[in-house]
Amino acid sequence: MWDIGCNDGVFSRIASAHSDYVVAMDADPLVIDRLYNTLKAEKNEKILPLYVDLTDSGGGVGWRGQERPGIFNRGKPDIVMALAVIHHMAITFHVPLASQLDMFRDLTPELIIEMPHADDPMVRKLLTNKRDGIHDDFNLDEFERLLNERFTVKSKMLLSSGTRTIFNAVRKG
């Protein structure tokens, strides 16, 4: 299992109780460093924290790009969890929702993903310095349409905040 956008690893820990191994990824190196040190002190070997910036993950590195393969060539997870991450990639880094969902479709047969609604406080904060209309397609209806093109939704749940929905979906075909 991969936990993309793991932050402090709370959900990675929960997932590790139900999974053989969790790769916990985040684009914040300080968060990953803290998680690594905490897991090391606990002697927790079921979670591997990795610094990964999906918006600039690149290919392999080393001689001829082959010494260490890029993250997408290191294995395919049975399930990916992406909580509190897609709005950052869409709004901050301008990666369209469709492209993100294509990546997830190509990566994993099962997905747990959180979609913050347009009225979510963090979404509004991220949009503060963006010109009007640039992210009009960032909304729950469009996300569900795009998700349903690529995945079959097994379940969805509105979180208590009322501004985020979590989906569990399996890849079509």
Model-derived regions: residue spans:
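Conserved SAM-binding loop of SAM-dependent methyltransferases across substrates and taxa
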Residues: 8-20
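Conserved SAM-binding motif I beta-strand of class I
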Residues: 21-26
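A conserved beta-strand element that flanks and buttresses the S-adenosyl-L-methionine
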Residues: 81
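A short, conserved alpha-helix within the catalytic core of class I
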Residues: 88-104
